[in-house]
């Protein structure tokens, strides 16, 4: 670490101590991040990613409790102007699971001395450190949200490179708590580069599968929700649309313009806005509003240690947060779990 980096880093440590109302020495030990600072860190993490900025990130007081947003059993409006028959308010909360449980997840982060030396010549040295940690925390949460299937202690990153054992994510919650909202193992008609059918599948195309899933799995009052979107992997969208794009390129003079319109982010699948999410399973499709997905973190539950590790030529930040990944209303969910393109029998 260069001398100028040393001076800036010491200032960073002093600032962290000041913000969290602890001594500089305590920063290198274990300390609880001040709830106000934690909220700012969460906001920075959410703003650092376009997907997280669209869903909810809620701070909750209790580690275990009821969801912040309770699903609806349906419409409540009615008419009763009688003077003899009383109006009867009904409980409109869903019967599907509505509890959450925040569990400890480690988001440890190391920054090399070399990287710090490079940042030392930037005017925003301290924000660069904070932003790097916030960004990685965001990516890890998205990865767990879409791939997490268990909570193992200890977790094994080598065996679970997508953090499958660091928590139960959105998709696994749907599988376990609302299996009636899931269609599994379907096929889509496969086509060649000229858009000619190779093998017929359960559905003619991805849009047809999405349309059927929405209309057969969602509660009636959610099917036409204007906030519904399609969330999938870029691989599936590209594979699905390539034959159509290629066919247009051979028959339409406005090739580049039309092809560009097909692959822009605003492209609609199943007549709904489509969002390509990082780390989303390549064989899955989720239909739901963004605001039906939430990450809960426990206020006051963020623990942190920032210390130098010269034996590894780095500064290490050891931090843990109590988190949960929540689907607020299962009635506004349709999940296709296992979608592939039909293959010819006997591989021929």
UniProtKB/Swiss-Prot annotation:
**Location relative to the cell:** Virion
The record ties this protein, via Pfam families, to:
Phage_cap_P2
Q: Which residue numbers fall in the propeptide?
A: 1-31
Q: What are the entry keywords?
A: Capsid protein, Virion
State the InterPro entries in the record: Phage_P2_GpN (IPR006441)
Q: Does the keyword Transmembrane helix apply?
A: no
Gene Ontology CC annotations of this record: viral capsid
Question: TM segments?
Answer: none
The entry assigns this protein to a family as follows: Belongs to the P2-like viruses major capsid protein family.
Q: Which NCBIfam families match?
A: major_capsid_P2
Q: What is this protein called?
A: Major capsid protein
């Amino acid at each position: 670490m260069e001398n100028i980096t040393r001076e800036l880093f010491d200032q960073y440590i002093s600032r962290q101590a000041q913000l969290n109302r602890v001594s500089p020495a305590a920063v290198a030990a274990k300390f609880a991040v001040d709830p106000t600072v934690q909220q700012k860190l969460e906001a920075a993490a959410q703003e650092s990613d376009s997907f997280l900025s669209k869903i909810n990130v809620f701070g909750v007081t209790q580690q275990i409790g009821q969801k912040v947003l309770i699903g609806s059993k349906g419409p409540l409006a009615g008419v009763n102007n009688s003077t003899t028959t009383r109006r009867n308010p009904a409980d409109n909360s869903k019967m599907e699971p509505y509890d959450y449980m925040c569990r400890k997840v480690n988001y440890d982060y190391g920054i090399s001395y070399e990287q710090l030396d490079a940042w030392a010549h930037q005017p925003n040295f301290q924000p660069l450190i904070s932003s790097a940690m916030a960004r990685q925390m965001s990516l890890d949460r998205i990865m767990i949200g879409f791939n997490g299937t268990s909570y193992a202690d200890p977790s094994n990153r080598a065996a679970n490179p997508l953090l499958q054992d660091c928590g139960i994510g959105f998709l696994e919650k749907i599988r376990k708590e609302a299996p009636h909202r899931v269609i599994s193992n379907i096929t889509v008609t496969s086509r060649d580069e000229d858009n000619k059918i190779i093998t017929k599948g359960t559905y003619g195309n991805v849009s047809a599968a999405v349309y059927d899933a929405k209309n057969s799995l969602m509660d009636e009052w959610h099917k036409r929700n204007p906030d519904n979107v399609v969330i999938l992997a870029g691989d599936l969208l590209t594979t699905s649309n390539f034959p159509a794009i290629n066919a247009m390129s051979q028959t339409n003079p406005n090739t580049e313009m039309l092809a560009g319109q097909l692959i822009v982010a605003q492209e609609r699948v199943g007549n709904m806005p489509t969002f390509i999410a990082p780390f989303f399973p390549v064989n899955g499709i989720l239909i739901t509003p963004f605001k039906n997905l939430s990450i809960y973190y426990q206020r006051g539950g963020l623990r942190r240690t920032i210390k130098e590790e010269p034996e590894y030529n780095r500064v290490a930040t050891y931090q843990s947060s109590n988190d949960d990944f929540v689907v607020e209303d299962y009635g506004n969910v349709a999940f296709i779990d296992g979608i592939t393109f039909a293959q010819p029998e006997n591989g021929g």
